[in-house]
Amino acid sequence: MAAPTYYTITFGCQMNRADTERMAGILESLGYVATEDELQADLVLYNTCTIRDNAEQKVYSYLGIQAQRKRKNPAIKLIVAGCVAQQEGEKLLRRVPELDLVMGPQYVNRLGDLLAQVEAGNQVVATDPVEIPEDITKPRRDSQVTAWINVIYGCNERCTYCIVPRVRGQEQSRQPQAIRAEIEDVARAGYREVTLLGQNIDAYGRDLDPKTNLASLLRFVHSVEGIERIRFATSHPRYFTEELITTCAELPKVCEHFHIPFQAGSNEVLKRMRRGYTHERYRQIIQLIRQYMPEAAISADAIVGFPGETEAQFQETLQLVQDIGFDQVNTAAYSPRPGTPAAEWPDQVPEEEKSDRLQRLNRLVAEVAAARSARLLGQVQEVLVEGPNPKNPRQAMGRTRGNRLVFFEGDPEELQGSLVPVRITATRAFSLTGEAVTVRASGP
């Protein structure tokens, strides 16, 4: 008898992608086998995101197709996980009665138990707040070179535009020993890089007893043999301390790339967003980073068209992008999320104005990023090879310590997992092309 098959699709952030990897690992421990054909899979799992309305609508579109399959073949298992599941709960069952399981992000490690309830004939909704348990099941990781490691779940912030605290719950930090054990495990499996993940990763440890912090965690895991690079995301400016910056500068494995969302360049907008910092404080953080690590790459997130944002306030965002010189900015037009204060405010910015501002911001981001990339022309950059260039299989693809994508001629299979010095011969806003100088052998 053939093993049952499963198919997953992930919407949203790195946290969701890491959660999907963990759920895939649980499914495989239960005997399921991955398939690329969602219309033939015995179990279909959508890991969802509520940050943008378009992502939510895509989920319902996919669910409509799967619901038709389920009506013809009731044995198919249909699961919605993640933030839409947490937000909608039983409403999802009323909208899509064919669903077997609706589970919030806090239940990722409990998927096996929830499936057992489904197998017993139950339709299950798991959205009540729970403590997130450690899970000994190994994730089915998408990459063979770089691994995501969750270190803190949830968020205690109360930004007026954001639904995340409602759907992901309060902060729950993992114990340092458990995090190090997982990193040691991926190192033994041949991984060369880890990215420590959290909604506000620099808030790590304040809920533990005894309290600790991200700087201490970085020092604790830095000595794991086999790991060549350590990254972390996403950081909140409120908790990005000088101690954290100096620790990153001192530890050679920590990459000189920091993702720190600023969201807006206007203090008035930041205040209404309830972000808890000013643009002056944000600039001070970047200045400190570049004081200790002059070549550090900085990426961020920004929102345009927040309720009440004037053209003059938007110009402050453009000025911040110009002044900082970001390597990348993930931009978005404000999207009202049900249940958030900002969604109820009367001074919503018209859609056409949001679209215009987004286009102008994107043009500037590309210009600034292109100038940052151009500085690397002729330099030799250390590139961790992740695999082949999807558009040209004769080229290897990897990332610099500053997280720039690099393409160069070479055997991707042979070089995968290797740290290769590459001389940069051409630059674009968000990627580089180069030539291998020498090859440093892969790890043991």
Curated annotation (Swiss-Prot):
Bound cofactor: record note: Binds 2 [4Fe-4S] clusters. One cluster is coordinated with 3 cysteines and an exchangeable S-adenosyl-L-methionine.
HAMAP family (alphabetical): tRNA_metthiotr_MiaB (MF_01864)
Binding site for [4Fe-4S] cluster 1: 13, 49, 83
SMART domains: Elp3
Gene3D superfamilies: Methylthiotransferase, N-terminal domain, tm_1862 like domain
Reaction(s) catalysed (UniProt annotation): N(6)-dimethylallyladenosine(37) in tRNA + (sulfur carrier)-SH + AH2 + 2 S-adenosyl-L-methionine = 2-methylsulfanyl-N(6)-dimethylallyladenosine(37) in tRNA + (sulfur carrier)-H + 5'-deoxyadenosine + L-methionine + A + S-adenosyl-L-homocysteine + 2 H(+)
Stated name of the protein: tRNA-2-methylthio-N(6)-dimethylallyladenosine synthase
